[in-house]
Amino acid sequence: MGSRAAWAMTTAIDTNVIVALWDRDPGLSSAAQSALDGALGRGTLVTTATVFAELMAAPGRSESFLDSFFRETGINIDWALEESVWRTAGRAFQGYAARRRKHRDAGPRRILANFLIGAHALEGDYSLLTLDDHLYRTAFPHLTVVRV
């Protein structure tokens, strides 16, 4: 039987998973907790500084609260994004904008942060845990997306 290292994987965590974890809806919070526990059981958890910055806008979430949260949960923060992440995010964002123009899409707009999160996961060869699988499957067809 192989060692844990032979099958361990890294899972990147989207902002919406952490927000769901803090949600007052026990069903949503429980689903997010179960998904995080499952991902942690398969390997390590990581997120981008983009997620950290987005979470600072959540009500009642201070910088020190977030520092403690990430330390206690063992979710590592990748504070630096490589050039390849920025380029991949830019290409995906460009494709998204072109699709919106072509279809005259009046639906919700996406922000660059979503594409940085997806590109970070793709370039790091991580799976991405999210509640928004449609966006990431469309923008990053080669990314392994896990829906909460």
Language-model-derived ranges and their functions:
Residues 14, 48, 110-111, 132, ...:
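Histidine- and aromatic-rich ligand-binding microenvironments
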Residues 2, 6, 76-127, 133:
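Active-site neighborhoods of divalent-metal-dependent phosphate/nucleic-acid chemistry enzymes
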Residues 64-80:
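Helix-adjacent hinge/juxtasegments
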Residues 62-66, 96-97, 146-148:
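Short, hinge-like loop/turn segments at secondary-structure boundaries
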Residues 134-148:
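C-terminal/domain-terminus segments
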Residues 61, 131-134:
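Short, polar loop motifs at secondary-structure junctions
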Residues 1-47, 56-69:
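Short, well-structured N-terminal submotif of metal-dependent ribonuclease cores
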